[in-house]
Structures are given as structure tokens and as C-alpha cells.
Amino acid sequence: MAEILKERSELDPQFQWDLTPMFESDAAWETALDSLDADIESLAAFAGKLTDAVTIGAYLDASTEVGRKVERLYCYASQRHDEDTRDDKAQSMYARVGSKYVKMAAALSFAQPEILSLPEETLTAIVNDPAVADYKFNLEDLLRGKPHTLTKAEEKLLASFGEVMSAPSEIYHNLEDADLLFDAVKDGSGETVEVTGSNFVPLEMSTDRTLRENAFHSYYKSYREHINTFAASYAGAIKAATAEAAARNYPSSRAMAMAGENVPAEVYDNLVATVRKHIPAMHRYVRLRKKMLGVDALHFYDVYAPLVGDLKKSYSYETAQEMVLKAVAPLGEDYQATVRKAYAERWIDVYPNRGKRGGAYSGGCYDSNPYILLNFSGTLDSVSTLAHEMGHTIHSWRSRQHQPPQYADYTLFVAEVASTVNENLLIEQLLANENDPQTRLYLLNQYLENFKGTVYRQTMFAEFEREAHAMVERGEALNAAALNALYKRLVTDYFGDDMVIDDEIQYEWARIPHFYRPFYVYKYATGYSTAVALSEGILKEGEPAVKRYKEFLSMGGSAYPLDELRHAGVDLATPAPVDAALEKFERILDDAEATLAKLQ
């Protein structure tokens, strides 16, 4: 019988986050919110005057301060809301501060076009003026985008097409969330099981192969029936991105998508080429999965099936805290001291309660502690989640300690690096101290699954996306037949001869929502590869690698992400980091195969 969740008031406060460093009370929050409108409205005084370095510097100081106030109000309300999403008061707080964010964005909208309308020689002089020295990197970045910024009238016209250009994404989400219906199926015992969009992956993780197979056929039958609509919506999304890229003087939609973080195309192409070089290792893993499952033919309804039974171990939260502390020991005493600080000062909301937001995240703002939301359940996965979120948290903490507010936030390109380094350090620490073959095999398989899902699978998606956009740019028809054929070819390449290429898998591209955020998925693969390279360096090289890594954690957004990673010792403009990561994958495969042999 499932455990009944307690109300938040029934839980021990020592396992709940302490938000009082942000605001002493909800009443203090209300007072601060009431004063915000005047702060936002004061920014309008700068409109039409951003023509010299002194005025621009004063504007940037003022807007940064207002931004800090809004961010602190938002973080408090958001976290209060997540404590119990049923709480009407917290819902109201969250909605009201959300509207202030919209108001602030509108109040600031004049600044960027006004600054960029200045002659280039004037802008160059302003960027190098001591009056804006604290914002030089931001202004240089703004200047970098000038060739792709249109006139005020053109920007207004392009903005008016915003809803039209986002329509394909809306069509996709409405189709997938509201219109797709799936036939109920029978499990291995003959019981009827409902299939939904949200339970499909859990069903595919079942140990009941009959259920997995039937759910697989039911699920993709609905996608097949709607595949022409999915293809039309995706083609529309690509055409919208291609049109905007052309309007903004970018050579391609990919160049536009990658320009924001100043990442060159060769990083993307290096990733695909290097993963392609290591595809034989993926084929080895497919053979290992087939062997461990003991099946004559491995189908795509077997790819999520558990290879090793769940560990029966349960961990107290206190044990989990110690496990994470041990795992990050290679990062030094000062890193561990911050972890202890997070534990002692109640940065973490540990246990589930009725109404609490599910999942986990790391949050907070420049003027608060970082905070972690967990729903700790005592599993090894829960321990890993604590390590993961602590990685984000200490990245945020060090960035905020070492950077001014305008440079404290790191980019999405590097966002998962620190969290994955911690996960890898945890699993390495567990493997180093585990002799039981069954437990070792469980841990090794978790490691392999992370590689498969985050490096190989996301790179396959990235290759699909690159080719789909290129087809539109070449003027080729992007219909269901073309997309299905492209996806099936890639799946065949990546999974190899030991995998049965089920007919339905050609429709899988249609269920990937990330494709409506162009050229985003590759960052999962580069981020994971970077984290593997860094964690390997930390464990093998020791202090020099740790020093570089901590400096990277302290950089926030003060440089472009590739430059930050180079500082840490990883150059994604070369194949080396992805090569190193996939060589690690091969060593884990060796270990898993040897461990399996001991059990047979």
C-alpha cells in the first residue's frame, strides 16, 4: 500500500528550506512588492537618453538593481508556491510577481534598440569607456549582435509575426497533449492496462515483455495515424526559423540558434563526427543488453527494460548526506564546507508533502542562498539527485560569490556540467568501494544508460535536426515520408545489426518536443561529455584539475561558455573531450562485461 503523504505542517522543519534570509515573512514580501512599481517606472526616465557612456552606465546600474529586487520577490513567491501548490495565498503571490516580471520586461524594452541604433564607431567608443567598465562584456556581446538587429520598424514588423511563427509549436503540443488517444492493451497476465502519453515510458520499463510490446504498438499506432500532421507542424517550425534567420542575416537557422552563446558550428559537427566514430561501442552495448535480457531478438520495446533488478537498499537522508560529502571529497575541503553549510543552514527542502511540487531543482537568486527542492524517497536515485542538485547549487553559490549580479548567471550551455560532475563522482566513489558483482553491475548499467541516453541518443537527435533543417534550406520537401526515412536511417546506424528495427520506430521523431526549440538537444551531449572529461581529470590529475574546475565554477556568465570550459581544461572546438568521454564509456562496458561473466 502506498504511503499517505503528510501535510507540510506535520513534517520536521529542520528538513524544510529556510526562506527567511530572503524575506522574514510573507508580510515583508508584500511590502517589498508594493514598492516595486515605482522602481520599475523610474527606468522610463532613461528613454531617449542612452547616447553616451555615463548615461548608459547609470541606466545599467539602475536596471540591474531593479532586476535584483524582482528576482528576489519572484524566487520567494515561486518557492512558497512549490511548498504546497494548493495554497491559494502562494498562488496569488506567484501570479502577482509574474506580472511584475512582464511589466519590467516592457519597461526595459526601449534600451537595447536604442543603444544598437547608435553608429558603430560611437558604440565601440562607449564599450571601451571606463564609465561602463563593469558591463564591458555584456556590451561587447550586444555589439556582436548588431549585424543581426533590424531597424526599429523591421523589428516591430517581425515581432508582429511572433504568434504566427510559434503556431507550429502550439499545434504540436495541442495535438500531442489533447488529441492523441491510445488503445488499452493486455499485459502478460491478460489484465487490461491503459496507455497514455505520461505512462508510456514507465510501461516500457516494465519487466513484463508482453506489456512492453503491446504498449509500444499501441503508442506508435496513434503517431502513425497523425504522422502527416506532425510532419506539417515540424516543417512549419523549421520554415519559420529559416525565415527569421534569413531576415536577420544569418547563414542558417543553426547559425542563428547557436549565436546567442557564441558557439561555432564546428562544435556541433565535431560532436556528431566524434560520436559517429564511437558508434561501434554503442553496438557493443546493444549486444550486452540483448545478452543480459536473454532474448533471441532485441526490439525497441526492450530498450528501457531493466537489465538488473532494483537494489533493495534503502538510504536514510542522513546517510545520503554523508555519501554526497564523500563523493565530492576530491574537490577539496572548501567544496565540502559549502555542502555542509547547505545542510546546516537549511538550503534544502527534503521530503515530499501533500501539494508539494514533484521532481527536484536548484533555485534561489543573487541575494539569497541557493535552494534545493527534493522529494527524497530513500532510493539510490534519490541520493544521486541530491548529488546532482548540489552540483548546480555550488556552481550558483560560487558564481554569486565571485561575480557581480550582471555576470552571476551561467548559460544553459554549461548548466548541466557541475551537476553531472557530482553524479559521476558519486558513482565512481560507489564503484570504488563495491565488491558485490550484482550491485556493481547495477551501478555500471546506470552509468552506461546515462551515456546511451545523454550522449548517443541526443547526438542522434542532433544529427536528425541538422539534416531536417538543411533539407528545408536546400528547398527539398520535408514531408512525413522524408522525415520517417531520415529517422529510420539514423536509428539503424546508431543501434546496429543486433537491434530489430521495428517499423514503428520511424515515427519516434514526432514525439520529441525539443525539436521545436531548434538546435538545443546537442547541449545535453556536449554537457555530459564535458562533465565526464572533468570528473576523470579531477580523479586522475588531482589538485591542478580541481583548481581549474573551481575557477570555472566561479565564472558565472562573465565569459562565453566555450572560453569558460577551456579555462576548466576542456576545449569543445576539438574532438578530444567527446573522444575521452566515449573512451570512458568503452572502459565501463569492459567492466560490465567482465562483471556479468562472474555472475554466469
Predicted regions and their residues:
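Conserved helix-loop functional segments at active or binding sites
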Residues: 326-337, 360-363, 392, 396-404, ...
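Short pre-active-site segment immediately N-terminal to the catalytic Zn-binding motif
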Residues: 313-315, 365-387
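Catalytic zinc-binding patch centered on the HExxH motif and its immediate surroundings
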Residues: 313-315, 348-368
